[in-house]
A protein has these predicted regions:
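Catalytic-domain carbohydrate-binding cleft regions of carbohydrate-active enzymes
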Residues: 89-106, 118-687, 691-693
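A low-complexity, Ser/Thr/Gly/Pro-enriched, surface-exposed linker/loop concept
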Residues: 2-5, 18-63, 101-103
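Short, well-ordered beta-strand segments enriched in hydrophobic/aromatic residues
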Residues: 19, 29, 65-69, 638-641, ...
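Accessory, solvent-exposed terminal regions and/or long lumenal/extracellular loops of proteins
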Residues: 699-788
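Short, isolated positions in well-ordered beta-strands
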Residues: 17, 64, 70-73, 90-91, ...
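Short, exposed beta-strand/loop patches in secreted or surface proteins that constitute
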Residues: 1-2, 19-20, 51-58, 63-64, ...
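Extended Gly/Ser/Thr-rich low-complexity repeat segments
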Residues: 20-24, 38-48, 73-87, 96, ...
Length: 788
């Protein structure tokens, strides 16, 4: 046994094991074939960890390492690792691990001129190099790590996939980057622990057969962190401790964001904002999708002057209306453009000769320089880093969806052609790093916001908001989206959203397709909406409305898609059912803004999670474990999404059914119907009214919810005092967070918190002294409303 102040190392089962206590509840386990290395990590933050008191002893063929909260016991003959509570009760067992030596190769043309097949896909224009050859660069390993889980134990997390699997027990999952897949090398257990693999290669999770294991495609060694945080919040706190705190997003990012594929001029963006202001419907951002470049210059970060020559003036007028903009940027560029040529001349392109090398710091700086000069300096406020899994093109076509294993090999293999296989899953992470770090160098007065389709562990510290990709408009997909959002939160990632209404709406009427594809009659496996006529179909209007109602309670509230427009006036006019329902929920989002922005503060300062699986707050409720279409929005609001039609099917076909919805109310607390204030006991199913203008929302007894009236943009100063809505029935508390909203002064203490404590026995709300201050701080005036 080798023991130092920071780790213990020993040979076991033909391997070398190093156990490194990081905190009292986090222990790192590194397994090497012959030696242990300390390579630089792309996902674990560099920091000086405090010394952790631990004991280590070898006894009866086992190496036992104990901190105050965790006991890890290594079987020296077999190499099995038992993870236990400090009192000896077991969490789980890592049964064994194996490392198989492989040749790590890269693909090059070997000095030949590349033979480039440029293909126009639904997901953009792509280069496919026809004469690539493999070249060995080093030796590495493929690894498997086997686990033994309790029969009733559930495994959640692993990022976002597309199948809607909530509990991964009994399932196989492929972890690779794809248009609708965002892998995370992290899972949590209902037994109260989590495991994070420091692995950036392709991975799989397998619990289908007799053995349960994770497969790591290309590594130097096995390297994982065991987190015994106990509660889900505790585990996520441990995860963020390792991977970095989530950055504060600008306050306006929590307002309503209007997007579609696509707007065509700067003036059109301005008119969208103006129309919302004229309707008095709240709005904070309008989004410019792809195709801002000159014709043929795909991915160029230079505006087409014939359509965006007045961009800066239009952006200024948008800012005068207290709104913001977001612009789409791509990592790949066509040859012939100025941006592409600059990367080519510097040698900063990957071997598809189109995509910049985001792993190169100088290349990231060049990308930022181009984006800043061509877009940021022209008035755009934030980034939409689209297609950040730039090598999934081979799967993004054809009429038949391939088998899961085939897609994994195809798309993963394409990433390994152009990236080192050890980092095949983290292009998007490095891309986000470049945007965040370089914008911060230039503009400390503007918070970074990067909406991106792919990501990885630690991306939260780069202000990267992930979204679920190009989904299809049908009710089943809406259900799946909720599950995937819950698993993303259980993966430690707090910033996730979706395309409200789904991206693709058209079924088989290809003439109505967007994305410039209305002349392509070939079926696409992913273009499988149910509504050929889009907003002209009442069935789609109902689906969109229900999607938006659920989306009101996500970290980002954003409408987007192709095939059909998404602005509110396309769903009718004021006084009609869909328009009024959409308006009601957009205004509800702003009514809740003090509550929502306080949750945003908690995400940064307290490592909180906004969209919360019921596992976070009701871990002992066995029935709550089964619920996949409900979630907590912060500590107080239970959101029950409506995921079935009640009024219309496709082609405006009337549906005859009750306008009610069955909801589960978790045990251990009382609940209020948000709309009627009717009280319910927890631990039961209830059926409540769910007409088109509302979905069931319940408030937890003891909740204190700060709200504001009359806002049309997030940073607007309320004309009336903030109301503190109290729902009696239990003691409760909430922390109101405030700051300037769009700079980084909060990092130096420029923010304020107010503790709100409801004393049930006294029937009194105690409003604490405001702690802290910041420039422009509003007067601390409140109106307390006790709900009866």
């Amino acid at each position: 046994m080798i023991k130092t102040e920071s780790y213990v190392q020993e040979a076991a089962g033909g391997m070398v094991y190093r156990l490194i206590p990081v905190t009292e509840e986090i222990i790192r386990c590194v397994i090497g074939k012959e030696e242990i290395r300390e390579p630089e990590s792309l996902i674990i933050e560099k920091k000086d960890y405090p010394e952790v008191a631990f004991e280590a002893e070898e006894k009866e063929g086992r190496l036992n390492v104990r901190t105050k909260k965790v006991l890890v016991s290594l079987n020296l003959s077999e190499g099995c690792v038992e993870w236990k509570h400090a009192d000896g009760s077991k969490w789980c067992t890592q049964n064994k691990a194996d490392l198989t030596k492989i040749d790590v190769v890269r693909y090059t043309t070997g000095g030949e001129k590349p033979i480039i097949n440029r293909v126009k896909t639904v997901d953009g224009e792509r280069n496919f190099i026809q004469n690539l050859k493999t070249e060995k660069v080093r030796e590495g390993y493929r690894a498997r790590v086997f686990f033994d889980w309790n029969e009733e134990e559930e495994i959640h997390g692993l990022g976002q996939a597309e199948e809607g699997i909530y509990n991964y027990r009994g399932h196989n999952q492929y972890l690779y980057q794809h248009n609708m897949r965002i892998p995370m090398p992290f899972f949590v257990s209902t037994e109260g622990y989590g495991i994070l693999f420091d692995c950036c290669s392709l991975m799989t999770f397998n619990d289908e057969g007799r053995e349960s294991y994770l497969f790591l495609d290309t590594v130097e060694q096995i390297d994982y962190y065991f987190m015994g945080g106990g509660s889900m919040d505790g585990i996520i706190r441990d995860y963020r401790y390792l991977t970095g705190k989530a950055q504060m997003l600008p306050k306006w990012a929590y307002g309503y964001i209007q997007s579609k594929e696509q707007y065509y001029t700067a003036k059109e963006l301005e008119e969208i904002v103006r129309h919302y202001r004229e309707l008095n419907v709240p709005l904070d951002c309008v989004v410019q999708d792809w195709n801002t470049w000159d014709p043929g210059n795909w991915g160029e970060k230079i505006l087409d002057q014939s359509r965006y020559g007045d961009n800066k003036e239009c952006m200024n007028r948008i800012h005068e209306m207290h709104a913001h903009t977001m612009v789409s940027v791509w990592p790949n560029m066509n040859a012939g453009g100025k941006n592409h040529q600059e990367f080519f001349d510097a040698g900063y392109l990957l071997y598809d000769y189109a995509t910049y090398d985001a792993f190169n710091e100088k290349a990231r700086e060049m990308y930022w320089k181009q984006a800043k000069e061509g877009l940021f300096d022209q008035g755009f406020d934030s980034w939409w880093c689209d297609s950040t899994e730039p090598f999934s093109g081979p799967d993004w076509g054809g009429a038949v969806k391939r088998e899961p294993w085939e897609r994994f090999l195809m798309v993963g293999g394409e990433h390994k052609k152009y990236l080192d296989p050890a980092v095949a899953n983290v292009f998007a992470l490095e891309h986000a790093k470049g945007i965040y770090e370089n914008q911060r160098k230039d503009r400390e007065d503007m918070r970074v916001l990067n909406l991106t389709r792919s990501g990885y562990a630690s991306g939260q510290k780069y202000a990267a908001m992930l979204w679920s990709g190009d989904t299809c408009a049908d009710w089943e997909n809406l259900k799946i989206q909720i599950v995937e959002g819950l698993n993303m939160g259980l993966s430690g990632y707090p910033y996730w959203t979706l395309d409200i209404g789904a991206f693709f709406t058209v079924a088989d009427k290809w003439q109505n397709r967007g994305c410039g594809c209305n002349t392509d009659p070939e079926p696409k496996w992913f273009w499988q909406g149910k509504y050929n006529e889009g907003v002209k179909d009442k069935g789609y209007c109902e689906l969109y409305t229900r999607w938006l109602q659920m989306g009101t309670f996500l970290p980002m509230f954003r409408s987007h898609g192709t095939d059909t427009p998404r602005e509110i006036w396309n769903f009718g006019e004021k006084g009609t059912m869909f328009y009024d329902a959409i308006e009601k929920f957009i205004k509800l989002r702003y009514h809740l803004m003090p509550y929502i922005y306080s949750l945003a503060g908690a995400v940064h300062f307290e490592d909180y999670t906004i969209m919360r699986s019921l596992l976070f707050d009701f871990p002992e409720d066995r029935e709550a474990r089964k619920v996949e279409n409900e979630f907590m929005f912060g500590p107080s609001l239970l959101v029950c999404a409506v995921t079935e039609p009640m009024y219309y099917g496709p082609e405006s076909t009337p549906v005859d059914r009750e306008k009610t919805w069955k909801c589960y109310l978790p045990a251990g607390t009382g609940w209020y119907d948000y709309w009627t204030n009717e009280k319910y006991k927890g631990g039961q199913y209830v059926t409540v009214e769910a007409p088109i203008d509302r979905i069931p929302v319940f408030v937890k007894a003891g909740a204190v919810i700060p709200v504001a009236d009359g806002l049309v943009y997030a940073q607007q100063e309320p004309k009336k005092p903030i109301q503190l809505m109290v729902y009696p029935g239990a003691d409760g508390e909430f922390v109101l967070y405030e700051d300037e909203g769009n700079n980084y002064n909060f990092e130096n203490g420029a923010y304020a918190i107010t503790k709100l404590v409801w004393d049930e026995s006294a029937g009194r709300l105690n409003i604490g002294e405001r702690e802290g201050s910041f420039p422009g701080m509003r007067e601390a005036v409140y109106q307390t409303v006790i709900v009866k």
